[in-house]
Amino acid sequence: MLNTVYQLKRPRQFEVAFKEMEIDDRQVIVRPTRLSICHADQRYYQGARAEEILRQKLPMALIHEGIGKVIYDPTGTFEIGTEVVMIPNRPVEKDDIIAENYLRSSKFCASSMDGFLQEYVQAVPDRFVRLPQGINPTVAAYTELVSVSFHAINRFLRFSHERRDVIGVWGDGNLGYITSLLLKKMLPDSKIYIFGVTENKLSDFTFADGTYCVNEIPADMQIDHAFECVGGGAASKAINQIIDYIHPEGTISILGVSEDPAPINTRMVLEKGLRIFGSSRSGRSDYEGLLQL
């Protein structure tokens, strides 16, 4: 069976490739119906990644966020026509300690293998999760992005102490919005404060208990824990600002992606006894938990 794959050949140039798809008795075939463009896809397209990385990974189909309909399932897991969310993480082994999205052997669509920008996507059944009936398909296309925040919050609940009266979220973009919204849902008794740079964006956080411009934070502000959702060149400033305002023995969850190292105030990390952890991507259990939320 021929599959049409739309690959990025070089920055700003796509090409159509026709690849043979082997049909077997253990893999499901899904036709993508809604896709979401991630900032990582934009960096590949714009050539904003290192030249060595581009040479190594291109040509490659982009997109790792999306949903689709099952068109073939020899395993009987799904009925034909079932709407599913596609999981981009492709583990090749299981580990009792390390989650599937942190195994160095795992592949990831639109990073170490072709993404979802193709006519058909083929994988074993557990790489697809059935969508709830009636869900808005456009909203469902963002499931992967939301699952990353869900994954980070669940790790935070494991790592942090139980005093969670005030949680700060640095970042007024999509990731900050999604993370703070989930925090409000999963920790309804906690106050969620948002720290950003754009007043128009901060005004969208109507569910938050408070919003602050990072240049106008009250001197007496104190938080128990924090999530960094800034990334890029401003990540260092955001993390250091968190360190300034967080209570001793607080936990800092880092979610923002930076291409360059971000220097932080390690002296105060030690003095306050802070715990800092990073989270990346997500696994099947995160999708299942999110869709049940």
Regions found by a protein language model. Give the residues of each.
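Short Gly/Pro-enriched turn/cap motifs at secondary-structure boundaries
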Residues: 20, 57-64, 109-113, 119
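Glycine-rich beta-strand-centered segment in the early N-terminal region that forms part
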Residues: 22-35, 50-93, 132-134
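Short glycine-/small-residue-rich Rossmann-like dinucleotide-binding loops
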Residues: 36, 74, 89, 230-234, ...
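Residue-level marker of beta-strand positions
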Residues: 65-67, 82-83, 120, 172, ...
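NAD(P)H dinucleotide-binding glycine-rich loop of Rossmann-like/cofactor-binding domains
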Residues: 88-166
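Mid-domain Rossmann-like dinucleotide-binding core that forms the NAD(H)/NADP(H) cofactor-binding site
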Residues: 133-216
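Glycine-rich cofactor phosphate-binding loops and adjacent beta1-alpha1 units
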Residues: 158-164, 186-187, 202-273
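C-terminal substrate-binding/catalytic core of Rossmann-like NAD(P)-dependent dehydrogenases/reductases
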Residues: 259-293
